[in-house]
Amino acid sequence: MDEEYIIRIANGLFDEAYMAKRYLLTMEQMRSCTAKYRDEMSHSFAFYNDAYSAMVYATTMALARYYDDDSDSIGWKKLYNDFANYVNRMPSNDTYRIEIKLCDVYLFSENKEFYDRLQDEKEKCVWNNFQTCGIMMEMKPKECLYYYKKKKKPLNKHLSNLSKQRNKAFAHNDGVLCFDYEGIDSAFPLDLDAMTALTDYALEFSRFVIAYITGTVKMIPGKNDNDLENTLLLVKNAMESSEIPQQKVRAH
């Protein structure tokens, strides 16, 4: 596989994950503001409800496309395999610094050499930072591939539910659960934490592939914490200011 083709796939999949992350951050804002600005949001309840539902749908579909592993699909599986072949054909002695969370160290226990290195770094990290950070590991390209393959393993349950939801509700209507969206969501749950984990991994892996081949590190979405709250604060101020004259009139 040539570099341009792999980069094209990686960029396309990165864009899918990027939009999914944007949707998730917006949903996070909406959930956060619901308790604080319930009265203000109630004036546009239908809008917020429809917008939230649409973003759940869009996020599910974006992730389903990213992780689609059908033989003819261009998704994570194809990108991983094509990139692995590229690394094997173009060996490099370069190393890459990747952060591994302390809670994920156990995933690599079957590889003794790699695991022992992790344990050594873990002891330094715990001693120096009291477990407040991850382990920064210097890895060769093939070790990076091993890392990303193992890191994906805990996501398999979420991926199974994502696939079931896509096949039974979003791509077409399953004959058994036809239009029973609540039943599908209950049988194959995929909450915001699960979608966030899938999205963060998707961004990280695609970003690594692009950086490895091109040397360019793509930016990932940051939290726009105040976007929605700023608007709702204006609504709140307008509501409060419009109530003042009415209260004075009633007082007289």
Feature annotation, model-predicted:
Residues M1-H158, I184-H252:
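Amphipathic alpha-helical interface segments
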